[in-house]
């Protein structure tokens, strides 16, 4: 069965329950959350996440698998500022605890940025950080995200991800989040030869490592290294390629998560596209009037 959803908000007093209700309103049967704002480390106590009510609502609506995304501020690739590295290690540990408490098995992580020290140095630091964070027997996997190669990001090639995974002692606790926009922006031909890209990934990393799929179109041409998401079918990857990926038999059991932009001219009143994009992908039929329909909701 197709597992498809989007990023939803976990906030206010209802927290996980609010996230589940938002996902259901989009026709989703999975979803992804941040445990708090992605730009900071302020987090509620686990007992304040409203987990019991949230899980009950999920069960009522057939949602059995969700994903957590670690905040952007974690950078365990930083070799120039020890405080940044230590913050990343400590906070990732606590995020894994929250992920386990919520009942998610995957926490998506941007591997890290070398901030000018070079990819080789950054990758060594990421390996060091992951070896510090991972506890043997933990029931949460860290899903390293395929990156676009913007700035000094590490993980922009399958080889870099494979190097990180190989360096981690308990790498059974590592998986991969395959982002279509990032991989396209990194230079892989996701739009025209996804099977070729997937075969290359399988040879270098192993297809069984993919546990989350971020489904995004791209505003940029292949290899631009920009990381700018576009609505499904309105970017450089295109609807045909993305619906092929979403329904790919080798990725059938993997949760597909949309992170596409809100729509509308009024910056203060943009509308979420997810209900419309999920329906369109389920029906395998591109709707060229989709953006107008989203704006009109």
UniProtKB/Swiss-Prot annotation:
SMART domains: AP2Ec (SM00518). One of its GO terms (biological process) is base-excision repair. Pfam families: AP_endonuc_2. Gene3D superfamilies: Divalent-metal-dependent TIM barrel enzymes (3.20.20.150). It catalyses: Endonucleolytic cleavage to 5'-phosphooligonucleotide end-products. Zn(2+) 2 binds at residues 145, 179, 214, 259. It comes from the Bacteria. InterPro entries: AP_endonuc_2, AP_endonuc_F2_Zn_BS, Xyl_isomerase-like_sf, Xyl_isomerase-like_TIM-brl. GO terms for molecular function: deoxyribonuclease IV (phage-T4-induced) activity; DNA binding; DNA-(apurinic or apyrimidinic site) endonuclease activity; phosphoric diester hydrolase activity; zinc ion binding. It is an enzyme of class 3 (hydrolase). Zn(2+) 1 binds at residues 69, 110, 145. Zn(2+) 3 binds at residues 182, 227, 229. Keywords: DNA damage, DNA repair, Endonuclease, Hydrolase, Metal-binding, Nuclease, Zinc. Its cofactor is Zn(2+). Its EC number is 3.1.21.2. Belongs to the AP endonuclease 2 family. Endonuclease IV plays a role in DNA repair. It cleaves phosphodiester bonds at apurinic or apyrimidinic (AP) sites, generating a 3'-hydroxyl group and a 5'-terminal sugar phosphate. This is Probable endonuclease 4.
């Amino acid at each position: 069965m197709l597992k498809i959803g989007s990023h939803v908000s976990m906030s206010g007093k209802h927290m996980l329950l609010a996230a589940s209700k938002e996902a259901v309103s989009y026709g989703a049967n999975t979803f992804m959350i941040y445990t708090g704002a992605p730009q900071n480390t302020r987090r509620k106590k686990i007992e304040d996440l409203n987990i019991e009510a949230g899980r009950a609502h999920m069960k009522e609506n057939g949602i059995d698998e969700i994903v957590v995304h670690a905040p952007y501020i974690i950078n365990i690739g930083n070799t120039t500022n020890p405080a940044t590295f230590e913050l990343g290690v400590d906070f990732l540990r606590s995020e894994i605890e929250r992920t386990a408490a919520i009942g998610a098995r995957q926490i998506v992580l941007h591997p890290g940025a070398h901030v000018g020290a070079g990819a080789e140095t950054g990758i060594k630091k990421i390996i060091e950080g992951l070896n510090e964070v991972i506890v043997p027997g933990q029931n949460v996997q860290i899903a390293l995200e395929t990156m676009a190669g913007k700035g000094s990001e590490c993980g922009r090639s399958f080889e870099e991800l494979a190097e990180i995974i190989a360096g981690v002692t308990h790498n059974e606790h590592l998986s991969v989040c395959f982002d279509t926009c990032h991989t396209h922006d990194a230079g892989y031909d996701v739009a025209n030869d996804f099977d070729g890209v997937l075969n290359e990934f399988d040879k270098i990393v192993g297809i069984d490592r993919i546990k989350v799929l971020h489904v995004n179109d791209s505003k940029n041409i292949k290899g631009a290294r920009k990381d700018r998401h576009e609505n499904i079918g309105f970017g450089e990857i295109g609807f045909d390629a993305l619906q092929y990926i979403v329904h790919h038999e080798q990725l059938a059991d993997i949760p597909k998560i949309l992170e596409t932009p809100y729509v509308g001219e009024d910056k203060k009143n943009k509308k979420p596209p997810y209900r419309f994009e999920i329906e369109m992908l389920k029906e395998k039929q591109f709707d060229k009037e989709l953006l107008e329909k989203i704006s009109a909701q």
